[in-house]
């Protein structure tokens, strides 16, 4: 796709943008010894949702959390739980994630499950569903599913580990995804390496949701409220300063 067209489409989106900015704390960067308190603090600090990475060590070479942990964390907040599912077979976890109190499942396109069937099954469990685009995926890969999902999550790092540097090369993909979404009521999130500066770049490209771990839970001041407010303000101001014409 011609990146000039993508840029122009991104400007059109920003000029008419009405979807609220959401800051979504990722507990992969939290203090594992006190996760309940960390989730509660992220909620009280203004986090809009809670991002839970479920990594089984097979898809990506890391281990994180599972449904029993999510169920244990559920009493600490009423904010929605988003599960970034990096475990196989993915379909085998839907029942347990629902029972654990999760609200949204984010699916990778290449984990061996039929995506259409997975989307249908997740909806049948009264949960919402999103698709994840890794740095290797193309924006067009989401096209067959756009009318059946609630969010597209563009990875701005290689998935599986926290604390990585933001991949600036993903910004054209964010703009392209925004163009493909059009006027559908679909959130567009970026996930990985989100700081005040990179949130500005992603917001200008069309993102409205920002999954942030290190910049919240490992902020220098340890004040999660200040960190979340700073990210939200950075993204909001970036869109306000965007071109008003197309």
Where are these regions (language model features)?
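Conserved anion-binding
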Residues: 31-34, 92-96, 102-187
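Hydrophobic faces of well-ordered beta-strands that scaffold small-molecule active sites
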Residues: 22-26, 50-52, 81-85, 105-107, ...
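N-terminal active-site wall of soluble small-molecule enzyme domains
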Residues: 52-121
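Glycine-rich phosphate-binding active-site loops on the catalytic face of alpha/beta enzymes
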Residues: 107-113, 153-163, 205-227
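Short, positively charged and aromatic/hydrophobic N-terminal segments
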Residues: 11-13
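C-terminal helical cap(s) of enzyme catalytic domains, especially alpha/beta-barrels
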Residues: 217-244
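Glycine-rich, proline-tolerant flexible connector loops at the mouths of alpha/beta enzymes
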Residues: 49-67, 157-163, 216-220
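Conserved, mostly hydrophobic/aromatic
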Residues: 35, 53, 97, 152, ...
């Amino acid at each position: 796709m011609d990146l000039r067209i993508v840029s122009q489409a991104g400007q059109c989106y920003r000029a008419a943008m009405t979807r609220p900015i959401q800051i979504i704390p990722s507990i992969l960067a939290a203090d594992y010894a006190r996760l309940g308190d960390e989730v509660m603090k992220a909620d009280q600090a203004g986090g809009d949702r809670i991002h839970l990475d479920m990594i089984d060590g097979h898809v990506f070479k890391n281990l994180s959390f599972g449904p029993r942990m999510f169920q244990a964390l559920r009493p600490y907040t009423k904010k929605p739980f988003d599960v970034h599912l990096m475990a196989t077979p993915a379909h085998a976890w839907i029942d347990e994630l629902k029972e654990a109190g999760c609200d949204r499942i984010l699916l990778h396109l290449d984990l061996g499950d039929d995506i259409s069937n997975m989307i249908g099954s997740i909806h049948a469990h009264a949960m919402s569903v999103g698709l994840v685009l890794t740095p290797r995926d193309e924006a067009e890969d989401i096209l067959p599913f756009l009318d059946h999902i609630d969010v597209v999550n563009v990875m701005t790092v290689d998935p599986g580990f926290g604390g990585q540097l933001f991949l600036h090369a993903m910004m054209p993909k964010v703009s392209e995804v925004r163009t493909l979404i059009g006027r559908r009521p679909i959130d567009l999130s970026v996930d990985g390496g989100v700081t005040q500066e990179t949130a500005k770049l992603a917001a200008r490209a069309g993102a409205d949701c920002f999954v942030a771990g290190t910049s919240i839970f490992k902020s220098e001041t340890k004040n999660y409220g200040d960190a979340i407010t700073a990210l939200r303000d950075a993204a909001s101001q970036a869109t306000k300063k965007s071109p008003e014409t197309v």
